[in-house]
Amino acid sequence: MPLTPADVHNVAFSKPPIGKRGYNEDEVDAFLDLVENELTQLIEENSDLRQRIEELDHELAAGGGTGAGPVIAVQPTQALSTFEPELVSAKQAPVAAVAETAEELAMKATRVLSLAQDTADQLTSTAKVESDKMLADARVNADQILGEARLTAEATVAEAQQRADAMLADAQTRSEVQSRQAQEKADALQAEAERKHSEIMGAISQQRTVLEGRLEQLRTFEREYRTRLKTYLESQLEELGQRGSAAPVDSNADAGGFDQFNRGNN
């Protein structure tokens, strides 16, 4: 199917899948291939037309007619198919009518050249419009993707900040609770230690008082014992002095007196 300006003008590309930018690459490539093929065919048909006109000029020159010089024409496929029968009939016409036919063909070829130029301009303009549209759509898509990426990044950062703040607040709360509990435990241990220390010191003080009392009793007993012993010994010495050195000493009496001394001290 030949390509027409209407086909180029009315062609529509589908939107790309999610995640792609611009039009669908396969469709764009296929369309460009089609344009390339049609333009190649147009050039080839142009060359055929040029060759046929040159052949017609040679026939006119060989027949002695006065025709127009060679004419180069450029036209689309539709125009070539329209004038091709006239070129064939011109070869079969009499020499007298060939000049008129060549002149008409030259005029028609000029119109075809103008039409080809207009078609080329229209194709160029359409391609530029499509290119601008594709570029604009690509920019819009890029801006949209960039905006979505920016929003996603901002949302991610905000969510991460919220989580970090929540974790920090939770950590601070736990730290305060643990610190308070540790302080309470330390206070309790200190209070218990102070209580036990007070109890121990009280018991030690009480025992010290008892020991000091007993020590004082022992000291008193020692003083009294020494005093009684001294008194007893003095009395014995005095008694011995009175009896004289000749009289025997009654050991039983002395032992009984010493026992009496001990009983008195006890």
Swiss-Prot record:
The Phosphothreonine modification is found at T77
Coiled-coil segments on the chain, per record = 31-64, 152-203
Report the domain of life of the source organism.
Answer: Bacteria
> Which Pfam families does the entry mention?
DivIVA
Keywords of this entry: Cell cycle, Cell division, Cell shape, Coiled coil, Cytoplasm, Phosphoprotein
Q: Which gene encodes it?
A: wag31
User: Does the keyword section mention rRNA-binding?
Assistant: no
Q: What binding partners and quaternary form does the record give?
A: Forms homooligomers.
A cellular-component GO term for this protein: cytoplasm
| Similarity comment | Belongs to the DivIVA family.
Q: What does this protein do?
A: Important for maintaining cell shape and cell wall integrity by localizing peptidoglycan synthesis to the cell poles.
Q: What protein name is recorded for this chain? A: Cell wall synthesis protein Wag31
Q: Where is this region: Disordered?
A: 239-266
Provide the taxonomic classification: Bacteria, Bacillati, Actinomycetota, Actinomycetes, Mycobacteriales
Q: For this protein, what post-translational modification is recorded in UniProt? A: Phosphorylated by PknA.
Where in or outside the cell?
A: Cytoplasm
Q: Which GO terms describe its biological process?
A: cell division; regulation of cell shape
InterPro entries attached to this UniProt entry: DivIVA_domain, DivIVA_fam
